[in-house]
């Protein structure tokens, strides 16, 4: 809780701090009781997730003016999700017994989520089957029967996402905007089949302001020996707060380039298809 004046809030320490935990298997809504002296308050709430009690948080929220990602960057983890909210309340001294004052705070994500889905799994397996067979034969030409064996397991391949330029890594509750970013950010992932032809390559959460934003990434594919098989051109990923952007294309077999088509039929999602 902070003084209600915005000027005071940015120049003085908070009045009181409260920390609560809750099992979200029971739902995200949470009702708490606070013991506050009479006065005007701005109540600011930050909520993030841990998988099990005692785990380290992905965010360091000790300073609401600069909530930072901490530790090595970890993509592909829905426990990176987080929520923020604020509201004002006036508490008056009253010698008469009355019902406690109540305050509802609507929580919203200060984040956007993006995900890459590749739709050339069959072609990739065919190509890799031939390459692996050729390598097994001492780099000789494959057999005259060039039908792939389909012994390739796509989960054996590593996907690496490289952020090109800056990746926002700090957020201010006071301004409701990202306030800092880092360069050289990357994270690893694996391919997970969605169907015979499609696989998800990985996803991440990014701090964004209330307007549309974007990050740029490159995606590298590596075999189980660490050999780089491909690296896309830089891909700009459009982001919108509390929306899930899904990028679909032939990311395994070819460098991603060209325009995108936005499917507006999703509520809360962007579908972007690389032709």
Please annotate each region the language model reported.
Residues 104-112, 204-211:
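Conserved "repeat-terminator" motif of extracellular CCP/Sushi domains
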Residues 108-122:
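A short, Gly/Thr-enriched small/hydrophobic beta-strand-prone motif that recurs across taxa
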Residues 30-32, 101-105:
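Short strand-edge motifs at loop-to-beta-strand transitions and within beta-strands
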Residues 19-24, 51-102, 184-194, 225-254:
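Structured interaction patches on ligand/partner-binding surfaces of diverse proteins
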